Amino acid sequence: MIREERLLKVLRAPHVSEKASTAMEKSNTIVLKVAKDATKAEIKAAVQKLFEVEVEVVNTLVVKGKVKRHGQRIGRRSDWKKAYVTLKEGQNLDFVGGAE
């Protein structure tokens, strides 16, 4: 069993984009920003416990940080991890419903 403190640190924020909205409508998938060291099992457990929904599958990827300029200096944004969480049939979780 994963400790509750760890579950709270795994999920960072919902990732709101046009692609994420389409995924939610078509395949009942939510997109989340998660901790870089989070595993699929931790993400699944955190979503099920915190949002009280049934998770079917979790897919993850690491988004590489962009190179950005600030004046003459060149910097780089940090890499971050994104999780596509597919909910079971009949389950619903709406992050952007009130944003319209």
UniProtKB/Swiss-Prot annotation:
Gene3D superfamilies: 3.30.70.330
Protein purpose: One of the early assembly proteins, it binds 23S rRNA; is essential for growth. One of the proteins that surround the polypeptide exit tunnel on the outside of the subunit. Acts as the docking site for trigger factor for Ffh binding to the ribosome (SRP54) and to nascent polypeptide chains.
Name the UniProt record assigns to this protein: Large ribosomal subunit protein uL23
InterPro entries: Nucleotide-bd_a/b_plait_sf, Ribosomal_uL23-like, Ribosomal_uL23/eL15/eS24_sf, Ribosomal_uL23_CS
Coiled coil: none
Keyword S-adenosyl-L-methionine annotated: no
Pfam families hit by this protein: Ribosomal_L23
NCBIfam families in alphabetical order: PRK05738.1-1, PRK05738.1-3, PRK05738.2-4
Residue intervals passing through the bilayer: none
Effect on the protein of changing residue 52 to K: No effect on trigger factor binding
GO biological process, one term: cytoplasmic translation
Subunit and interaction comment: Part of the 50S ribosomal subunit. Contacts protein L29 and trigger factor. Might also contact SecE and probably does contact SecG and SecY when the SecYEG translocation complex is docked with the ribosome.
SS bond list: none
PANTHER family, sorted: 60S RIBOSOMAL PROTEIN L23A
Domain of life of the source: Bacteria
A GO term, aspect molecular function: structural constituent of ribosome
Family, similarity comment: Belongs to the universal ribosomal protein uL23 family.
Keywords associated with the record: Ribonucleoprotein, Ribosomal protein, RNA-binding, rRNA-binding
GO CC annotation terms, alphabetical: cytoplasm; cytosolic large ribosomal subunit
